Every structure is written in structure tokens, then in C-alpha cells.
Amino acid sequence: MTYCDKSNQTSYPFVLPNLPYEKESFKPHFTAETFEYHHGKHHNAYVQNLNNLLKDKEELQKKNLEEIIDWSSQNQNIAIFNNAAQVWNHTFFWHSIKPNGGGKPSGKILKQINEDFGSFEEFCEQFKAEATGQFGSGWAWLVYHNNRLQIVKTANAGTPIANGMQPLLACDVWEHAYYIDYRNKRPDYVDIFIKHMINWEFVENNLTK
């Protein structure tokens, strides 16, 4: 598992992980209310739903979260996949951001971005286009796949780990991620995400694993 090994997600019954920062830490860009709903209600609901779906499935209870995602994807169990993937996606997202983050990175990740996108500015343009262009609910991701960085988007609960990709960064573009503070202005939210929220240390740690 990527960074999520530290989140109490590795075995049934799954537990809502604590945020790695205070809910108020993203002011003035986000209010604590956004995190109270996003983490405390939406993410928590996926955790509880997953536990309820697994309560009579002893074989699945022996699997870790990534194994459950893989099993439910292969067996087309949509309910289990959706909730398991959303538990994983959200925990990964919480580590993808940090207070006073964003801006231009340095080190190996910047070198790789320049190699694969031409420049950091071009990466930002492409990432913003993919994140804002996702129709309806979903996610925008920076992944490492086929020996290069790629930007991909997934609809609803879709996750790159179900397709053999290594996720480095996640941007949640479900409306519950930004609607309290930004209403229908997803482009503004994505712009704030890039400029003020990305945890580049986390991204680089995932790249160098």
C-alpha cells in the first residue's frame, strides 16, 4: 500500500483515520466546516458502509483494503468496490494536501515533471484541465505508469490502483470536497489546490518508493 499503511485501514473492521492536521489549518482557503463534512461525514460513511458490507463475508475480512478493492473490481461487486475505493481514495487525498502547501516543488519530483511535461507550468495547466474537465463526480490523479508521470482522471469511486498504476497525488473533485466554500466554482478550487495545498513531500515519497 502507498501512504495509507499508516491510517488504520489495513484490516477489518476499518476505522476512520485521523486527519494529519487540524481542520482549521487551511484557512483562509477552506473553512473547518468543509473538513467536518468531508472527513467526518462523507469519508466516515464510506468506512461504515464498507464494514457493514463485509460483516458476513469472513473471507473478505481477512484481506487488506487494496486486496478488497482488487477482488471487488475483478468480481464486479460494485457496492463493495465503491465504498472500499472511496475509503482508500480519501485517506490518500488527506495526505496529498497540507497547510501552506502547493507552489513549485523541488528535487526529484520537479526533475521528473520537467522531463515528462516539459515544465512545471505545463504540468499545472494539464492537471487543472483534467481536474476541472472531469464530468460529474470523480478524481484527478498524478500517477507514475509505464516509466513516466501521467495525469489521469477517474469517475466516481474509480482509483488508479485498480488499473495497476502507482498514484502519487490525488485531487478530489466530488462536489462535497469544495461546495461549502466554492459552490460551483470547481476551477477556483483546483487553482487553490495547486497553489496552496499540494503536499509535494508526500508526492516525492511516493515517487521514490
UniProtKB/Swiss-Prot annotation:
Superkingdom: Bacteria
UniProt xrefs under InterPro entries = Mn/Fe_SOD, Mn/Fe_SOD_BS, Mn/Fe_SOD_C, Mn/Fe_SOD_N, Mn/Fe_SOD_N_sf, SOD_C_sf
Q: What class of enzyme is it?
A: oxidoreductase
Job of this protein: Destroys superoxide anion radicals which are normally produced within the cells and which are toxic to biological systems. Catalyzes the dismutation of superoxide anion radicals into O2 and H2O2 by successive reduction and oxidation of the transition metal ion at the active site.
Disulphide-bonded residues: none
Q: Where does Fe(3+) bind?
A: H38, H90, D172, H176
In terms of PROSITE patterns, this protein maps to:
SOD_MN
Q: Which cofactor does it need?
A: Mn(2+); Fe(3+)
The record's catalysed reaction(s) read: 2 superoxide + 2 H(+) = H2O2 + O2
Record Pfam families: Sod_Fe_C, Sod_Fe_N
Task: Tell me the cofactor note.
Answer: Binds 1 Mn(2+) or Fe(3+) ion per subunit.
Task: Note the Gene3D superfamilies from the entry.
Answer: Fe,Mn superoxide dismutase (SOD) domain (1.10.287.990), Iron/manganese superoxide dismutase, C-terminal domain (3.55.40.20)
What family name appears in the similarity comment? Belongs to the iron/manganese superoxide dismutase family.
Q: Which residues bind Mn(2+)?
A: H38, H90, D172, H176
Q: Name one GO molecular function term.
A: superoxide dismutase activity
* EC numbers, comma separated: 1.15.1.1
Q: PANTHER family this protein is in? A: SUPEROXIDE DISMUTASE (PTHR42769), SUPEROXIDE DISMUTASE [FE] 2, CHLOROPLASTIC (PTHR42769:SF3)
Q: Which UniProt keywords apply?
A: Iron, Manganese, Metal-binding, Oxidoreductase
Instruction: Give the taxonomic lineage as stored in the record.
Output: Bacteria, Pseudomonadati, Pseudomonadota, Alphaproteobacteria, Rickettsiales
Q: What protein name is recorded for this chain?
A: Superoxide dismutase [Mn/Fe]
